[in-house]
Amino acid sequence: MEMMQDSFQVHRIPQSKYVDGVRWLPQASALNRFFATASYDADCDSSSIEIQSLDPNPRGNHNTNPLIESLSSWTSPSRVSSLEVAGNGGGGGSFKPMVSAATSSGSLHVLMIDLVEGAAIEEFYAAEGERFHVGRVEGVDWREGGECVTVGEDGRVNVVKIVNGEGLRYRKVFDGNGLVAYRAVKWASPTEFVTGGYGFGLQLWDQRKSGEAVSQLKGNWFQGKTSAIVHSIDIHPSRKHTCIAGGSSGTVFAWDLRWPQQPIVLSGVGASENINNPLSESEVWEVQYDSYTKSNVSSSRILPVMTCSEDGILGIIEQGEEPIELLAEPCAINSFDIDRQNPQDVICSLEWESIAVFSRP
């Protein structure tokens, strides 16, 4: 396994609360960086979305920790289960991005952040009630145009759209009536998305076709060797026929929709014996394609993927290559985000009430 920690400086910054999730916000200017955290205060059992600014070089000194300032917050009705940046649908682009917070009580809230006026939270929309989700909303993904898809432990799949002046409108795509549960979702096209949950199974849905999923990777391919839950899914914007998934026992695998019956296992259960040092053997909480790591492989191979795990590893996995370890923390890494505008920059939320920020060379 290749180690890269010595090639860049990692800044670990304590927080006053547990950080469930973290996402970069669009860069509104050359000087200011902003990010959102889903924070949980165990002392008073309250959860919030906090908007924070980051100055990577306070007072022009490159040798000091970045300066982080909390600018605004919004109190959630229950613990935040999914934090996402809601694209530009209905928002003001880089200056007024939207952030969505899904909750453990089954609601979805959309906040508009004014980065010009001190990151004030100007307004919010909500979708809630028993007709929306019953119980925890596990996964949310947005696409351009202000439309998202939500999945939950209740087995429901909803498509939600921001309607200016009216709030959120949603329609139910599927209701598993509690017999199935979904943990992750990702758009593949304006009409198609992929879901994942228990059993290392993935499902492709097409909004043009009602009812069941139009294709699926059955969850029994791992032959019951371990508990199997998909926690995160990502789809590369230029290769929408291939999605990547991360889950239990350090497992990261790809599903090529052109050959839907067999996964391409990159790490964990069923991985190639040529990989001597698996990146992780615990729960993989998040996966994202990493556009910053250059690959010279052919178009038939899987592009590099960044992952974080319960055993504190943040690293990069590429098909047929030894994994690269970026961070090895003494606690779980709950989530991470690669800055879309500056993909060398990565931010992580750590189990021990802190965040880690670094910029790759």
UniProtKB/Swiss-Prot annotation:
Q: Which organism is it from?
A: Arabidopsis thaliana
Does the UniProt entry include the keyword Protein transport?
Answer: yes
Q: Which PANTHER family match?
A: NUCLEOPORIN NUP43 (PTHR22652:SF0)
Q: InterPro entries from the entry?
A: WD40/YVTN_repeat-like_dom_sf
What's a BP term from Gene Ontology annotated to this protein?
protein transport
- Report the protein name in the record: Nuclear pore complex protein NUP43
Q: How does it assemble?
A: Part of the nuclear pore complex (NPC). The NPC has an eight-fold symmetrical structure comprising a central transport channel and two rings, the cytoplasmic and nuclear rings, to which eight filaments are attached. The cytoplasmic filaments have loose ends, while the nuclear filaments are joined in a distal ring, forming a nuclear basket. NPCs are highly dynamic in configuration and composition, and can be devided in 3 subcomplexes, the NUP62 subcomplex, the NUP107-160 subcomplex and the NUP93 subcomplex, containing approximately 30 different nucleoporin proteins.
Any one GO CC term of the record: nuclear pore
* Compartments (UniProt record): Nucleus envelope; Nucleus, Nuclear pore complex
Where, in residue numbers, are the WD repeats?
A: 132-173, 177-215, 225-265
The residues that cross the membrane are none
Disordered: annotated span? 51-73
